[in-house]
Swiss-Prot record:
InterPro entries given in the database record: Flavodoxin/NO_synth, Flavoprotein-like_sf, Flavoprotein_WrbA-like, FMN_Rdtase-like_dom, NQO
Annotated TM spans: none
Name assigned to this protein: NAD(P)H dehydrogenase (quinone)
Key words, A-Z: Flavoprotein, FMN, NAD, NADP, Nucleotide-binding, Oxidoreductase
Entry cofactors: FMN
PROSITE patterns associated with the record: FLAVODOXIN_LIKE
Catalytic reactions of this protein: a quinone + NADH + H(+) = a quinol + NAD(+); a quinone + NADPH + H(+) = a quinol + NADP(+)
Organism: Marinobacter nauticus (strain ATCC 700491 / DSM 11845 / VT8)
Residues where substrate binds: 99
Length: 199
């Protein structure tokens, strides 16, 4: 048995959708116990709602200390200028105690993202890896593990580094079936590796 956490931040719901799909892929692996949680919102409620934020997200809010309870953590964040969202950064900045005790060392880590126009998705994932590397986590990219990576018949997120979706400049585009297939593959791939390492 391997415990897998899908931990995300989503403002408009794109990453929430991706997170639930990643979890679906992980749950399809025998021996994977999968939980979906989100990081706390740091914006004031009124500002969040005025910006069009999606308030009705069902996942419970995580506490940084509980990351040590999992064998694998799959992180999801929208890109902010080629970096993770500030809400995710604030959450991870509270894991210094875990780092000092090596609590995440050897655990599996992977990242997925969303972008407005496609710019920054790979940079967001690889810059996120820096934090995971400092924790000593085993970084899991996707490579080109499923055919959807090679289909260029439509706008498509998804990179060898991690799943992604392109939301459009106004956020109106929702994750496509191909993007969701890549997200599902990421969950499955990480869960399988977590079981090999920790199961």
């Amino acid at each position: 048995m391997a415990k897998v956490l899908v931990l995300y931040y989503s403002m408009y719901g794109h990453i929430e959708t991706m997170a639930n799909t990643v979890a679906e892929g992980a749950r399809g692996v025998d021996g994977a116990d999968v939980v979906v949680k989100r990081v706390p919102e740091t914006m004031a409620d009124e500002a969040f709602l005025n910006a069009g934020g999606k308030a009705d997200q069902g996942a419970p809010v995580a506490d940084p200390k509980e990351l040590a309870d999992y064998d694998a953590i799959i992180f999801g964040t929208p890109t902010r200028f080629g970096n993770m969202a500030g809400q995710m950064r604030t959450f991870l900045d509270q894991t210094g105690g875990l780092w000092a005790e090596g609590k995440l060392h050897g655990k599996v880590g992977s990242v997925f993202t969303s972008t407005g126009t496609g710019g920054g998705q790979e940079q967001t994932i690889t810059s996120f890896w820096t934090t995971l590397a400092h924790h000593g986590m085993v970084l899991v990219p996707l490579g080109y593990g499923i055919p959807e990576f090679f289909d260029i018949s439509e706008v498509n997120g998804g990179t060898p580094y991690g799943a992604s979706t392109i939301a459009g400049g106004d956020g109106s585009r929702q994750p496509s079936e191909k993007e969701l297939a890549i997200a599902r593959f990421q969950g499955k791939h990480v869960a399988e590796l977590a079981i090999k390492l920790h199961g």
